[in-house]
């Protein structure tokens, strides 16, 4: 170590981590003990951040992708002066504490992302770096480099084994994200044992092939060597950098260092005592921080951070004078607000016009893109099918970062995680598209978006067996039920173009949850009532889209998406036979469940017990709405390859079958 205060600070990070994990009787000490020098060097010598304001917009972003090493992050947050107290450290992994087992965004000040599912932190960091480049290209002007921060991540071997890290690293290299720097805690150990049991690839050649700069630090305790590598990484703005730092997991533990035993379990009282002796730590008290360490962090983090933000605020004030309209637009974007009156840009569709909801979604995207400049997104190599292209929006590429169309390539998981990073970064309203059946490929990222409360928008097209000829591999069955089961995710399957416009409006208005828009490939008719009723109806999750003509329905037809049009046609056929039913459009179960019982009973009158649910997906869940006297027309087997109309007929999604099933319910 160059200076004793630096050695003391690093040892303090290590001992705080050891003590918190011992007290919790649970946790992962090995990574914080091994990676403390690189994290300390980054936080005190390179990162621009202000603990007094964790939300300073131009701060450097830091993602601990190896989220199991959370005590490394919590120790740094505490020492740096973030609102994480010593009592918080003592409550590590306990009910209601600020220091959960893995870092959680929105839960702990200074935590930039929820991590723990390995690989996703790297991909979220890629998304943050993408957001920084786009916003810099959009808003920076001569003399005003308002947005120019770096994005840093610390990852481990496990992160690099995950497929999402490969997808994201490939994308980052392609996009030449030079302000992205990943420190790789390379300790040759995984949870199960030595790394050579499962991982022997040449990481350097792999990342160089992706288009990254690769640097290596041989001694993970040598902070001068680490600092030199970080300087070199920051100097190359033409490509992202991976810095492999060779470390010893559980550094200093005389019996456990360098073994898998120190990865995911407390050291134990005796080993903890011996480790502190090995560190020449002379303080008997647990959770002890020498006053000079606090002073050191004040001098290296808090004071410089406050000055840097103050200087940035001065620059922003001058920018507001020089570019008032641009500055107002940026301020609004940072605050997550939409332009006044933007919803007037939403198209309204006349009854009778047939249009696939993926196509109306594409029209909505292009209409709102003109009114909402922070709209930014793309597709996983399906833009022409998902209809996600912003016409005239330009391409987000190394020579045109101001472009609004992102070409994610066939990297669904990286797309999902990068969208999370963009949403975490702020300043953008982001969306990503793929086929609904491939939502499985990005599901873990959707789950993290829901867990973090991020308003990401998913454009999921080709939503049923109506896909047809491509067959069962491309026909979603269980996917609606699966996504509906996820907490804090709004799933909307609109019936027509007006419901689609309403769904987009609700998705953009969301501030605390992601939205999945589930859209058809095939044309569907625009229904008579939706121009007037769609927004409030979709907002409430379900509504009577076509009431029984006599005002006294004998039965209810409940449907979503393209099946609503089918239900309306069946309603007409039943009426011709003197049977009166109401049609309920139920685009969003989660929104409907959030309504008061009085509204739910208004839409689904308890007295009308004969109910038929119609949906081209799994039946699971519909029983709560149809009740004991109802019936469900759904699909609980895989699809088939044939023209869509033929498959729908074979699976019973015809007017004749709906009429027959309804009459059977009524005993007619």
From Swiss-Prot:
Binding site for Mg(2+): 157, 187, 189
GO molecular function: metal ion binding; transketolase activity
EC number: 2.2.1.1
A Pfam family assignment: Transketolase_C_1
This protein's record includes keyword Membrane: no
Catalytic activity: D-sedoheptulose 7-phosphate + D-glyceraldehyde 3-phosphate = aldehydo-D-ribose 5-phosphate + D-xylulose 5-phosphate
PROSITE patterns the record matches: TRANSKETOLASE_1, TRANSKETOLASE_2
SMART domains linked: Transket_pyr
Activity profile over pH: Optimum pH is 7-8.
First-tier enzyme category under EC: transferase
GO biological process, one term: pentose-phosphate shunt
Record bears the keyword rRNA processing: no
Cofactor(s) named in the record: Mg(2+); thiamine diphosphate
Applied biotechnology: The thermostability, stereoselectivity and wide substrate specificity of this enzyme offers good opportunities for applications in biocatalysis for ketose and chiral threo-diols synthesis.
Residues that, per the record, bind thiamine diphosphate: 68, 116-118, 158, 187, 263, 438
Residues annotated as binding substrate: 28, 263, 358, 385, 462, 470, 474, 521
Temperature-related properties: Optimum temperature is around 60-70 degrees Celsius. Thermostable. Retains 100% activity for one week at 50 degrees Celsius and for 3 days at 65 degrees Celsius. Activity decreases rapidly at 75 degrees Celsius (half-life is about 15 minutes), and at 85 degrees Celsius loses its activity immediately.
Assembly mode: Homodimer.
Protein role: Catalyzes the transfer of a two-carbon ketol group from a ketose donor to an aldose acceptor, likely via a covalent intermediate with the cofactor thiamine pyrophosphate. Can use L-erythrulose as donor and D-ribose-5-phosphate as acceptor substrates, forming glycolaldehyde and D-sedoheptulose-7-phosphate. For synthetic purposes, is able to use hydroxypyruvate (HPA) as donor substrate, making the reaction irreversible due to the release of carbon dioxide, and various aldehydes as acceptor substrates, which leads to the corresponding ketoses.
Record's protein name: Transketolase
Species: Geobacillus stearothermophilus (Bacillus stearothermophilus)
Underlying gene: tkt
